[in-house]
Amino acid sequence: MAAGEPRSLLFFQKPVTFEDVAVNFTQEEWDCLDASQRVLYQDVMSETFKNLTSVARIFLHKPELITKLEQEEEQWRETRVLQASQAGPPFFCYTCGKCFSRRSYLYSHQFVHNPKLTNSCSQCGKLFRSPKSLSYHRRMHLGERPFCCTLCDKTYCDASGLSRHRRVHLGYRPHSCSVCGKSFRDQSELKRHQKIHQNQEPVDGNQECTLRIPGTQAEFQTPIARSQRSIQGLLDVNHAPVARSQEPIFRTEGPMAQNQASVLKNQAPVTRTQAPITGTLCQDARSNSHPVKPSRLNVFCCPHCSLTFSKKSYLSRHQKAHLTEPPNYCFHCSKSFSSFSRLVRHQQTHWKQKSYLCPICDLSFGEKEGLMDHWRGYKGKDLCQSSHHKCRVILGQWLGFSHDVPTMAGEEWKHGGDQSPPRIHTPRRRGLREKACKGDKTKEAVSILKHK
């Protein structure tokens, strides 16, 4: 303002309008702008209008430029997404260049470019479309689980988790499989189950499967049961290589061939009955009486014989039987075992390391089963050779048979009259107890474990 102007003219100056500060583009200039520049222009104009409204402290109508920009943005966004949907996935975001497999993912992503419509978490920085989703997310940081089940007292962060949990108590399974008819509680469980039926084709009863031994040209045919279903491609022998680099050598004679049948008996259980090994190849006696369930298919086939297994670990354990020298081999008695733990348990018999000691007598055993059989001997044979009566009484107390008095050293107790069998009192009873041992009645406070 000039110094000579009167002071009263300040109150009659025209207020600043939006058109005075707005930047306008012609149609040719607007067409030259890319998507990011258009978004930046819209944000600047919207922020300018907000600042002007806050300074004026009065309600101002939206200018034509702001209304036009908002309408054009919505129209541009719809046309871009429509073009992408007609062309098919991936759906492309023209703002940042990201691609999405579904249109819903693209819609959710477009809210990130508009800060006015996003709700960000102050702890992890994640963005959400609605404040409700943000409040559910904050419960995870705070540890709040307000939704509680009245039947089992389990708590959940949101109502959807509680509703899914209630299906367990109600037995509600709305999702059913169209192939086998099984029903599930969630859609995710159904999709996980449907993967079992994928690539499973029924095999005719007269169809044969050709198997080849790796490293050789030998091939043989093996029939496949009608109820068995095999996944195409898994019957190829390439998925089961031999555990050693050299070619397998089959046993036909010697001590190792005699122990081969015992090795196969200790292998993992299979769904088919195994026949004894004769010659160089194993034969499989299959039984068609019980159909195979689709969820328990034997898809891992042995390249040396016609056996099939449901797990790859069972197949690798079975292939050890075809090797010349099994890994779990005892050098003392030439016995072979399917696992290393059984070999260690067997070698204790040679090393005389009997770690299971009887607490009553001085006998020791190499296996736990032997000690348990020794403890149960009070009803059968007299396995405890040191003290018959002492061993029987203590074992009876341990096993809960203290009221049953066994025969001691061939002496028979007569029931009836004044003669009665001696009473055995456990040391857990308090006070002085009247003990009886071989007819001698004494009063003592010591335990029956020390009485002889």
Curated annotation (Swiss-Prot):
Q: Where is the KRAB domain?
A: 16-88
**Is Transit peptide among this UniProt entry's keywords?**
no
Swiss-Prot/TrEMBL GO biological process terms: autosome genomic imprinting; regulation of transcription by RNA polymerase II
Site Crucial for 5-methylcytosine recognition: which residues?
A: 185
**Localization annotation:** Nucleus
| GO function terms (MF aspect) | chromatin binding; DNA-binding transcription factor activity, RNA polymerase II-specific; RNA polymerase II transcription regulatory region sequence-specific DNA binding; zinc ion binding
Checking CDD domains in the record gives: KRAB_A-box
Provide the alphabetized UniProt keywords.
Developmental protein, Diabetes mellitus, Disease variant, DNA-binding, Metal-binding, Nucleus, Repeat, Repressor, Transcription, Transcription regulation, Zinc, Zinc-finger
Keyword Nuclease attached: no
User: What functional role does this protein have?
Assistant: Transcription regulator required to maintain maternal and paternal gene imprinting, a process by which gene expression is restricted in a parent of origin-specific manner by epigenetic modification of genomic DNA and chromatin, including DNA methylation. Acts by controlling DNA methylation during the earliest multicellular stages of development at multiple imprinting control regions (ICRs). Acts together with ZNF445, but ZNF445 seems to be the major factor in human early embryonic imprinting maintenance. In contrast, in mice, ZFP57 plays the predominant role in imprinting maintenance.
The record's PANTHER family line, in alphabetical order, gives: ZINC FINGER PROTEIN, ZINC FINGER PROTEIN 57 HOMOLOG
The family line of this record is:
Belongs to the krueppel C2H2-type zinc-finger protein family. ZFP57 subfamily.
Domain remark from Swiss-Prot or TrEMBL: The KRAB domain is required for function as transcriptional repressor. Zinc fingers 3 and 4 mediate recognition of the target element, ZF3 interacting with the 5' half (TGC) and ZF4 interacting with the 3' half (CGC).
Write the protein's name: Zinc finger protein 57 homolog
The organism that produces this protein has a lineage beginning with: Eukaryota, Metazoa, Chordata, Craniata, Vertebrata
